[in-house]
């Protein structure tokens, strides 16, 4: 295998790695955004004291950790 052929194979491997990395990164952005939104809602409810109030806690059970 000549130097030119080895260099071509190297470039193809780099390109394939970049494409796979880029597409998997974009796929995870949606999951990260959803988790970030839920976390920010939980922080907002907790800071306001909502999770300490029974009625508010029942209405926001998903954010306050369930019904107790």
Swiss-Prot record:
The modification Sulfotyrosine is found at residue 63. It is found in: Secreted. Keywords: Acetylcholine receptor inhibiting toxin, Amidation, Disulfide bond, Ion channel impairing toxin, Neurotoxin, Postsynaptic neurotoxin, Secreted, Signal, Sulfation, Toxin. Residues 1-21 form the signal peptide. The keyword rRNA-binding does not apply. Residues 52-54 are annotated as: Lacks the Ser-Xaa-Pro motif that is crucial for potent interaction with nAChR. GO terms for molecular function: acetylcholine receptor inhibitor activity; ion channel regulator activity; toxin activity. Its main location: secreted. The modification Cysteine amide is found at residue 64. The cysteine framework is I (CC-C-C). Alpha4/7 pattern. This is Alpha-conotoxin-like Ca1.2. It comes from Conus caracteristicus (Characteristic cone). The lineage of its organism: Eukaryota, Metazoa, Spiralia, Lophotrochozoa, Mollusca.
